[in-house]
Amino acid sequence: MKDKIFIFLQYIIPHSLTSRLVSKLAESKNKHLKNYLINLAIKKFKIDISEAKETDINKYTSFNNFFIRELKDGLRPISSDKKIISSPADGVLSEFGDITNGSLVQAKGKTFTLKALIADSSTTDFTKFATIYLSPKDYHRVHMPIDGKLTKMVYIPGKLFSVNKVTAQNVDDLFAKNERLVCYFKTEIGEVAVIFVGALLVAGIETVWHGKVAPNYYKDIQIWNYDNDSFNIEFKKGDTLGWFNFGSTVIILMPNNNISFKYNQSNANISVNQDLALIAE
């Protein structure tokens, strides 16, 4: 019954208005308010502040600034092996595997289409996927899983349903309904996409090359092309791509059938830069 009420509320809550109000609070630079919110989050979500590069909450300019905190150097080591694809984020590896007949697994018994996710029917090369859920306690920066060059970024407007196990099991096409940002990269294995999926209460999605893109900055699909001589935006595996100002989900799409995942089952905890998959010879 509790889950049904939660799902019902997801459909009647004004997603954009709620997220904008939360964003105003999260961006407040009032010292007393932001310190209260930070301390509340640390206590409620059991955030390990000792992992942060800056452990003094007074040094954070806002609640958002705290949520996109950097980690201590060397805390998430990364493999130098070029055949290892690393995790782009801290969180839970909620689903992963093959893209079968153009569909990805959302949760047990539920699938959604690649076409709906990326709002593009012309791309058919993606054959593997991994979905990582970032809870409020997790580190919120997203990193590059493999060496690559940015070729395109696509903003897709949408809803802002909460993203968690309950909504994944009960809201059809959840990740294809929510607002999202699809970043395409040219890599040695072909085209790879890293997708930032928005959610209720997520105060923003930002990238290091563009700045803030969401929530609901645009009413229509927006496309930025970077695959020309005017741009040369390259990333090494482990470089920071961007961040969420609260928590949500990252989906990585990969093109190569010779990729094998390093996990046997879903819902495993995973850390950024941890080995996610292996590129076979």
UniProtKB/Swiss-Prot annotation:
A GO molecular function held by the record: phosphatidylserine decarboxylase activity
Cofactor(s) of this protein: pyruvate
GO cellular component terms given for this protein: plasma membrane
Main EC class the enzyme belongs to: lyase
Reactions the enzyme catalyzes: a 1,2-diacyl-sn-glycero-3-phospho-L-serine + H(+) = a 1,2-diacyl-sn-glycero-3-phosphoethanolamine + CO2
Domain of life: Bacteria
Alphabetical list of InterPro entries matching this protein: PS_Dcarbxylase, PSD-B, PSD_type1_pro
Pathway the protein contributes to: Phospholipid metabolism; phosphatidylethanolamine biosynthesis; phosphatidylethanolamine from CDP-diacylglycerol: step 2/2
Keywords assigned by UniProt, alphabetized: Cell membrane, Decarboxylase, Lipid biosynthesis, Lipid metabolism, Lyase, Membrane, Phospholipid biosynthesis, Phospholipid metabolism, Pyruvate, Zymogen
A Pfam match: PS_Dcarbxylase
Residue numbers marked as site, Cleavage (non-hydrolytic): 247-248
Pyruvic acid (Ser) carried by residues: 248
Localization annotation: Cell membrane
GO BP term, example: phosphatidylethanolamine biosynthetic process
Cofactor binding comment, as recorded: Binds 1 pyruvoyl group covalently per subunit.
Membrane topology: Peripheral membrane protein
PTM notes: Is synthesized initially as an inactive proenzyme. Formation of the active enzyme involves a self-maturation process in which the active site pyruvoyl group is generated from an internal serine residue via an autocatalytic post-translational modification. Two non-identical subunits are generated from the proenzyme in this reaction, and the pyruvate is formed at the N-terminus of the alpha chain, which is derived from the carboxyl end of the proenzyme.
EC number, UniProt record: 4.1.1.65
Active site: 90 (charge relay system), 143 (charge relay system), 248 (charge relay system), 248 (schiff-base intermediate with substrate)
Task of the protein: Catalyzes the formation of phosphatidylethanolamine (PtdEtn) from phosphatidylserine (PtdSer).
UniProt subunit comment: Heterodimer of a large membrane-associated beta subunit and a small pyruvoyl-containing alpha subunit.
Similarity comment text for this entry: Belongs to the phosphatidylserine decarboxylase family. PSD-B subfamily. Prokaryotic type I sub-subfamily.
Protein name: Phosphatidylserine decarboxylase proenzyme
